[in-house]
Structure formats: C-alpha cells, structure tokens
Amino acid sequence: MLWLFQSLLFVFCFGPGNVVSQSSLTPLMVNGILGESVTLPLEFPAGEKVNFITWLFNETSLAFIVPHETKSPEIHVTNPKQGKRLNFTQSYSLQLSNLKMEDTGSYRAQISTKTSAKLSSYTLRILRQLRNIQVTNHSQLFQNMTCELHLTCSVEDADDNVSFRWEALGNTLSSQPNLTVSWDPRISSEQDYTCIAENAVSNLSFSVSAQKLCEDVKIQYTDTKMILFMVSGICIVFGFIILLLLVLRKRRDSLSLSTQRTQGPAESARNLEYVSVSPTNNTVYASVTHSNRETEIWTPRENDTITIYSTINHSKESKPTFSRATALDNVV
C-alpha cells in the first residue's frame, strides 16, 4: 500500500503552484497504428533523484513507479483494462502494445523529485493502416470525340484522418477524392492521373491512364451503336415483310371482288340451270350454278330440227299423244 500512499501524497502536495500548469503545456502528438505498438517517451530532470513517477490516462491513474538505484523498480499498474498491454523501458517511458481505438486520448507522466515536479503531456491518436485503394470512373464520350472523366478515389475503412489528392505531372489538381477532367485525344498526349491517399501513419497511391479509360468508353460506345443499328435493321426488315404481306393480301381480296363484279346478270342467268319436277299438282325448282363456265349462245339454223319433249306426268290419268306436226303448230 506504500505506492498508493505515495501517489496520493504526490497529488495533494504538488498543486497548481508547484508544477507546470496543464494549460501552458503543448502536448506531444503521438500517432499509433491500430493493432501495433507505440512508445510515449519520458525525459528525466538532469542531476536530480526521482522519487516516483505516475502515469495518467484521461486523468485516471494508469501506473505508479518507484525507482531504486540498487534493485528493480516497483511498478504498480492501476488500470486493469490496459495492464496486460503495458510495459516500461529503462527510462520509464510507457509502451502500449496491441493498440485499440479506445486507447486514443490524453496521457500524462508526473515525475516527482525532492525539489521539483515535472509534467509531460501526450495526445495519442490511433490510426488505421491504409489499404485497398481504388479508383472508380464514370466516363462519357461526346460527339466531338472529347472524353470527360469522372474519377473517385477511396480506401477501405476511411475516416476523417484520411486525406486525398489528385496529381498529374507533379502538380496537384485537386485535394478532394473526386476529380473531373476532359481529355481530347486529338490535341492531348497520353496523360496519367494519380490519386494519393494518406494519413499520419501510411499512404497509398493509384494511377489511371486517361487514354486507356477513353478507349474503353469508345469501344463501349461503338458496341452500343452497332447493337442499336442491328436492332433497327431487324425491325425495318420485319416491318417491310409485314407490310408486303398486307399489300399482297389486300390485292388478292381486290381481284376476287373485281371478278365477282364483272359477271353480268345474263351470264349469271346462263350459269344457272333450272330443273322442273311436277309431282301431281306441285312444282319444285332446283338451280345449279356453274361458276366461270364458258357458255355459247345457241343460234338456230334453217335445217335444224326442233324437238320438244313433253313433261311426263306420273299420275294414272292417260295423256293424249300429239303428233309431231301438231306440236310444231302449237309452237308456232
């Protein structure tokens, strides 16, 4: 319990009038890499014997050390959360391993001697090692063959401590992750654009070729244009075939209708044959149509013999039989 008593005695004995005030000190900025180790350096007063050292983290006691000239120092870790990851050098500088994001904060070392006290302040930042830098692009090709590039740079797990900039030929073009440039192959030579991502512990870079990106866009534009041309051609061919079929069908219907209209009443009458059957007292007419049959008009000649056949009645009554001369008289 001696170390605890001495620590409390140090806190109460060295007030604002006996130590350097916190407001007048500039903390030392120390950057640590997530998962790795960091050391907070400690300097001793020259020519003075150190009684004890207290390490604080965010104003909470972290460790209490009592140096000895003839034996190993007494080291008492007062923060169990960081106890297994704490270590001290021969000069009692603090080493913190397997860094975590929660280790970020303010650290202080209070060194007590017989005549004075020294306060060292630190600000520890835990940063991620940058990795997996990528550049995405959205390119557009105009009709005048000018290529417009929209470039975006990114890294994995980026935070506010990561900065981006774009460079070309050693000149900084932008201090943002986004860059928009126009490139004309007719007047511009091959140009590379480099994105640089960095934080306090690491940096990455990635370069892209404007010529390569624009060539890819041109190929895509040509392929798209060819596909549209082929689709348009196929649609035109199918439309022409459908239109041709409609015209042929309409023409066929018109020819059929015209043929029907050219047949006059006389030809229609000639194409009809009537058969008269008179069973008993009823008469039944039947007609047979001979479409498109060629019919010759019969013209009687002088020497032709005209024969008329009488209708046979199937009734039992006997009909008188007329002679050929009588029949001819009746016709006349």
Swiss-Prot record:
Entry's Gene Ontology BP terms: immune response; innate immune response; positive regulation of interleukin-17 production; positive regulation of natural killer cell mediated cytotoxicity; positive regulation of type II interferon production; T cell activation; T-helper 17 cell lineage commitment
Superkingdom assignment: Eukaryota
Ranges where the Ig-like C2-type domain occurs: 132-209
Transmembrane segments: 227-247
Effect the entry attributes to changing residue 110 to A: Inhibits dimerization
Positions of modified residues (Phosphoserine): 278
UniProt signal peptide: 1-21
Residue ranges of domain Ig-like V-type in the record: 35-120
Keywords: Adaptive immunity, Cell membrane, Disulfide bond, Glycoprotein, Immunity, Immunoglobulin domain, Innate immunity, Membrane, Phosphoprotein, Receptor, Signal, Transmembrane, Transmembrane helix
Post-translational modification: Phosphorylation in NK cells upon engagment by SLAMF6-expressing target cells is leading to receptor activation.
UniProt membrane topology term: Single-pass type I membrane protein
InterPro entries per record: CD2/SLAM_rcpt, Ig-like_dom, Ig-like_dom_sf, Ig-like_fold, Ig_sub, Ig_V-set
Motif (ITSM 2): 307-312
GO cellular component: external side of plasma membrane; extracellular exosome; plasma membrane
Subunit: Homodimer. Interacts with PTN6. Interacts (phosphorylated) with PTN11. Interacts (phosphorylated on tyrosine residues) with SH2D1A/SAP and SH2D1B/EAT2; SH2D1A and SH2D1B can associate with the same SLAMF6 molecule; interaction with SH2D1B is mediated by ITSM 2.
UniProt comment concerning the protein's domains: The ITSMs (immunoreceptor tyrosine-based switch motifs) with the consensus sequence T-X-Y-X-X-[VI] present in SLAM family receptors have overlapping specificity for activating and inhibitory SH2 domain-containingbinding partners. Especially they mediate the with the SH2 domain of SH2D1A and SH2D1B. A 'two-out-of-three-pronged' mechanism is proposed involving threonine (position -2), phosphorylated tyrosine (position 0) and valine/isoleucine (position +3).
Entry protein name: SLAM family member 6
Organism: Homo sapiens
